[in-house]
Amino acid sequence: HAGIVGDEATGAVSTPIYQVSTYKQEAVGKFKGYEYSRTGNPTRHALEVLISDLEGGVAGFAFSSGMAATSSIMMLFSKGDHVLLTDDVYGGTFRVISKVLNRFGIDSTFVDTGDLSNVEAAIQENTKAIFLETPTNPLLKVTDIEAIAKYAKEKGLLTIVDNTFMTPYFQQPIALGADIVVHSATKYLGGHSDVVAGLAVVNSEELASELHFVQNSVGAVLGPQDSWLLMRGIKTLGLRMEEHNESAQRIA
C-alpha cells in the first residue's frame, strides 16, 4: 500500500473518480491546481503518486497503455540518438522501436544484456540509453540491473527498465540505479483483466519535467475511470504476487 493520502477536496480515503475535462478558474488564468484533464486530473494524479511511491521514484506518470508509456519515454530522444535494448524485449516494444521510431531517426541495437560484455561492445558514440526488460516477456531472460546501471552512469547514459513482470512488489529498479521504470499495468499491477494502462516512474525532477512535457504534448493519458480501476487493483498486488510466486515454485 502506498499513495493513500485522502482526497484533498473531500477527505475521502478512496480517491473519487473525477470524470471531468475542464476546471473552474478562480479568476482569469488563476487555476486551483488543474486546468485541463490531458495535462492533469486528480484521479490520475493519485495513481501517479501511488506508483511513484511504490517504485521509490520522484514522479509517476499514467498512460493509456504500456506501449503509450514506452513510446512517450522514447520521445525523450531525438533524431540521430541511439538506444541499446535487451534482445528479448516485449514484441510491442520491438515493433515500435524498429518499425515506427526508426522513421524519426532514432537508432537501436538489440543485444543479450545478460552479459555486460555484449552491452559494452554495442555502445556507440550516439548511444543515449540502455533499455532493459528483466525478466523478459516471454522467455524470462534476466539482466543484472545494478551492473548495467553502474556501467551506464559511467558512460553518461540513461538506464530504462521495463518492470512489468516483477512489479515493484518484487523488484525496484530505481533502488538498483535505474533512471526510468516503465510498466504495462494491464498485467500484474491491474490484475483483473479489466483495464489497459501504462505507467512510468522517473528518478529526477529533470526527467519528470521532460516526460510530463511529452505526456501533455502527445496526450496518451489514462482516463479517470481506468486510473481508479488500476488503483483498486494495486491494493491487492501483494496478495496476488505472493500467490503467483507460490504457484510458480510449485510448477518449477
Question: Predicted segments — roles?
Answer:
Residues 13-17, 32, 59, 226:
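A generic secondary-structure signal marking the coil-to-beta-strand transition
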Residues 1-17:
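Short conserved active-site loop signatures built around small residues
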Residues 22-71, 76, 92-99:
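Conserved N-terminal alpha-helix of the aminotransferase class I/II PLP-enzyme fold
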Residues 7-10, 40, 189:
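Short Gly/Pro-enriched turn/cap motifs at secondary-structure boundaries
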Residues 2, 21, 113:
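Active-site donor-binding loop signature of nucleotide-sugar glycosyltransferases
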Residues 61-252:
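Conserved PLP-enzyme active-site core in the AAT-like
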Residues 12-13, 45, 56, 104:
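Short, basic and Ser/Thr-rich N-terminal targeting/leader segments
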